């Protein structure tokens, strides 16, 4: 005895096609792609649109405060407070050519969503436990054609950061560079 599935096939194709058309836009707001979580590394996305420069930072919390759990001690709470102060000051985190006349406007910080655990203080982090800092820095550049380079000073200011992957998007195109303590300046054009 043969079972014929052909009469069901057109309906199945329509259902699958419907999912590809309707579902992705409905889920788009819930999906946010993040770079891999790597200790010692941060990701910067720098986009120049007209006169506005926006730099986004994504970093494991361990790079910023030295841990990835909810702060438990006065020292850890002080580190979180100092991180908020540092990441709120976009003037201190990035150097640019003075000829570009870029003026820092604002910073938006998204602190980590700490995972609460029953860890014992002084013990290593639980495997798989991750927390990230995200920040967005906005600048107005009155001579954007002169914005030829960017130096992420945060390589010196954030704990344990050895590398910054800088993704750059300008009217001239997109590309990526890696900044390290030995090679801090990245080309913007």
Regions found by a protein language model. Give the residues of each.
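Bacterial N-terminal signal peptides that target proteins for export
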Residues: 2-14
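Sec/Tat signal peptide C-region and signal peptidase I cleavage site
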Residues: 22-28
């Amino acid at each position: 005895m043969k079972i014929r599935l052909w009469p069901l096939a057109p309906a199945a194709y329509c259902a699958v096609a419907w999912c590809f058309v309707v579902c992705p836009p409905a889920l788009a707001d819930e999906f946010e792609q993040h770079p891999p979580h790597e200790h010692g590394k941060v990701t910067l996305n720098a986009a120049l649109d007209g006169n506005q420069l926006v730099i986004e930072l994504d970093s494991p919390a361990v790079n910023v405060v030295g841990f990835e759990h909810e702060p438990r001690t006065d020292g850890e709470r002080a580190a979180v407070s100092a991180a908020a102060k540092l990441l709120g000051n976009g003037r201190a985190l990035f150097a640019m050519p003075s000829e570009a006349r870029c003026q820092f406007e604002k910073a938006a910080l998204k602190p980590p969503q700490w995972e609460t655990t029953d860890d014992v203080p002084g013990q290593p982090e639980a495997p798989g436990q991750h927390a990230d800092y995200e920040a967005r820095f906005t600048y107005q550049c009155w001579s954007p054609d002169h914005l030829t380079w960017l130096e992420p000073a945060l390589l010196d200011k954030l704990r344990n950061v050895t590398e910054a992957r800088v993704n750059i998007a300008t009217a001239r195109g997109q590309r990526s560079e890696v900044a390290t303590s030995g090679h801090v300046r990245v080309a913007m054009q």
